[in-house]
């Protein structure tokens, strides 16, 4: 959090409230700039973290088949409108030479990459590319489904609509059977 200028955020929030015609001195808004600054520091904490750090410790196991962590909840902020989007990520990889990561590391990588002004497409690619670089697996497949408040609260105003993005790396780019297999596991309840 030390790289985030909380006072600057507080001033900006005051300016926004004044610009929309609010009285920043009324009781309900007195601490709002401070609360918003703390919230942004938390929501953008991924700007000052590197998801690769989670994969510096690996394990060597006799396993070279699918590893899938499903339904990883996440939230992020749309970089176009600075409103939230949230959903779940499904992260799969096939280990190479038995190199595996702790399962929680996949969720932590999603969280770190999502906690910054973002696009869903970039989160999907960044998660896959981070795993490819750090674990050198035979393949990675990432699917993210999310609801975007910029489509729910404004513009299109379609609550409940979901955006789905996917990225295939390694064997998943070339092998349709493997792709279908991982998608069938993702769709299982």
Curated annotation (Swiss-Prot):
Keywords: GTP-binding, Hydrolase, Metal-binding, Nucleotide-binding, One-carbon metabolism, Zinc. GO terms for biological process: one-carbon metabolic process; tetrahydrobiopterin biosynthetic process; tetrahydrofolate biosynthetic process. Its EC number is 3.5.4.16. It is an enzyme of class 3 (hydrolase). Homomer. Belongs to the GTP cyclohydrolase I family. This is GTP cyclohydrolase 1. It comes from Lysinibacillus sphaericus (strain C3-41). The lineage of its organism: Bacteria, Bacillati, Bacillota, Bacilli, Bacillales.
């Amino acid at each position: 959090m030390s790289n985030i200028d909380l006072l600057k955020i507080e001033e900006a929030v005051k300016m926004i409230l004044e610009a929309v015609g609010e009285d920043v001195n009324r009781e309900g808004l007195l601490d709002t700039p401070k609360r918003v600054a703390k919230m942004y520091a938390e929501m953008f904490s991924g700007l000052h973290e590197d998801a690769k750090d989670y994969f510096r410790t690996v394990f060597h196991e006799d396993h070279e088949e699918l590893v899938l962590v499903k339904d990883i909840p996440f939230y992020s902020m749309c970089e176009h409108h600075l409103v939230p989007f949230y959903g779940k990520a499904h992260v799969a990889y096939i280990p190479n030479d038995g190199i595996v990561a702790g399962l929680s590391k996949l969720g932590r990588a999603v969280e770190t990459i999502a906690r910054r002004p973002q696009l869903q497409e970039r989160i999907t690619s960044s998660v896959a590319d981070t795993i490819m670089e750090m674990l050198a697996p035979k393949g990675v497949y990432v699917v993210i489904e999310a609801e975007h408040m910029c489509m729910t609260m404004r513009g299109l105003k379609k609550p409940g609509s979901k955006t789905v993005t996917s990225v295939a790396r390694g064997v998943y780019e070339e092998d349709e059977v493997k792709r279908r297999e991982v998608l069938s596991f993702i769709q299982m309840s």
